[in-house]
């Protein structure tokens, strides 16, 4: 089937880029089939498996694996049809008991914050975890509780679409939770790298697919990081009726510029640090990746989400607080909120490098606007940075 689609472009997939302009991504049948056949060859899903689909099917990630691969194999797909809040997801996982879970970091991090953190933050639990003979048993119990909460039948959780909170990732490795992190983009329909959870290298984004190639382009050979560039079966033909953007995104020798900065090890594992367009250059010449600071801040008490911006050469964190949690504890008062955020700011700055320290936390009145894959539309908040 893939051969007869080789030169036919399917209906363009529209998505929002960081600049705010929509681009139609032209994906061929081969691009889509490359992802589907990879899923079949690696047995991500088997005939008769159950899948809970809660990612937008208009997004390449959900479309390729929750729908195309799932239907090609012959699985039972349950469409959630609701906003995937932790409470709704927990109930759905219990009912469906999926064999594979495909998700984005925001969802899994909320589950960690709501299910796991309340357990490990208890004084008695902290004491027990400090005893070497007990920590292994307790981690095993926590792992079982988390697996049971997600339905108890899945072989692994595949996370992609955005950067994973390093604290959450480290904890999942510590308890030997079966998860892996992949990497992709709509222009690759979407998969670029993936490794099964038992082969996954911590802090990586998986291994480059055998039908893809990746290289790290550095303008200065002495730079530690470079732009990740890819080519192969999954790469789009270009942007719909936009030759200028197409020319800009491809190198002269045919590699796709991802716009992501990172490294590649000898085993073809990709390590991603951040987006070149969101990187902030400090006054001392250091590269600051706001997503890494946000990941730490989002894991702190009563922080629902955050956005780190540069204002007058200083870092400022916009925070949308978890008002529901504050209300439930009777803490939703201005003085309480200020005390909590001051403590969060102190703890945040104690956990980052000197050039990454945040000057202030500014409360934001609403949730940040997001893309279908739940990434914040950063470009909408540039004017706040310039205030």
Give each language-model segment a name.
Residues 305, 310-316, 345-387:
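Conserved C-terminal "lid"/linker of ANL adenylate-forming enzymes
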Residues 222-282:
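Conserved ATP-binding/catalytic segment of the ANL
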Residues 235, 269-298, 325-336, 352-358, ...:
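Adenylate-forming
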Residues 261, 300-324:
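C-terminal boundary motif of the adenylate-forming
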Residues 33-50, 57-145, 153, 178:
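Conserved AMP-binding/adenylation subdomain of ANL enzymes
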Residues 1-14, 21, 44-50:
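Conserved pre-ATP/AMP-binding loop-to-beta segment of ANL
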Residues 78-80, 157, 164-226, 234-237, ...:
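Conserved ATP-binding loop and adjacent catalytic segment of the adenylate-forming AMP-binding
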């Amino acid at each position: 089937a893939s051969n007869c689609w080789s030169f036919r472009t399917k209906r363009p997939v529209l998505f929002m880029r960081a600049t705010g302009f929509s681009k139609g991504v032209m994906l061929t049948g081969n691009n889509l089939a490359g992802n589907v056949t990879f899923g079949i060859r690696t047995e991500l899903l088997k005939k008769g498996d159950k899948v809970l689909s809660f990612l937008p099917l208009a997004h390449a990630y959900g479309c390729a694996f929750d729908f195309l691969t799932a239907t090609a194999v012959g699985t039972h797909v349950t469409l959630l049809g609701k906003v995937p809040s932790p409470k709704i997801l927990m109930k759905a996982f219990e009912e469906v008991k999926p064999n594979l879970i495909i998700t984005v970091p925001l969802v899994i991090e909320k589950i960690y914050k709501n299910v796991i953190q309340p357990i490990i933050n208890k004084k008695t639990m902290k004491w027990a975890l400090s005893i070497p003979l007990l920590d292994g048993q307790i981690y095993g119990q926590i792992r079982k509780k988390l697996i049971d909460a997600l339905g108890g039948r899945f072989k692994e959780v595949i996370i992609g679409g955005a950067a994973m909170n390093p604290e959450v990732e480290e904890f999942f490795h510590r308890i030997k939770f079966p998860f892996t992190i992949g990497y992709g983009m709509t222009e690759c329909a979407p998969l670029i790298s993936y490794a099964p959870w038992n082969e996954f290298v911590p802090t990586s984004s998986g291994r480059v697919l055998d039908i893809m190639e990746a290289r790290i382009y550095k303008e200065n050979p002495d730079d530690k990081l470079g732009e990740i560039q890819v080519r192969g079966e999954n790469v789009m033909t270009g942007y719909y009726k936009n030759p200028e953007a197409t020319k800009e995104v491809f190198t002269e020798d045919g590699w796709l510029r991802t716009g992501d900065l990172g490294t590649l090890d000898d085993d073809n594992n990709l390590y991603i640090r951040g987006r070149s367009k969101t990187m902030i250059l400090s006054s001392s010449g250091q590269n600051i990746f706001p997503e890494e600071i946000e990941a730490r801040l989002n894991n702190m008490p009563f922080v629902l989400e955050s956005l780190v911006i540069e204002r007058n050469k200083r870092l400022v964190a916009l925070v949308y607080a978890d008002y529901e949690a504050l209300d439930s504890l009777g803490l939703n008062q201005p003085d309480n909120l200020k005390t909590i955020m001051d403590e969060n700011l102190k703890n945040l700055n104690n956990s980052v490098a000197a050039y990454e320290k945040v000057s202030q936390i500014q409360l934001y009145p609403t949730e940040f606007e997001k893309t279908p894959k739940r990434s914040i539309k950063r470009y909408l908040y540039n004017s706040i940075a310039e205030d």
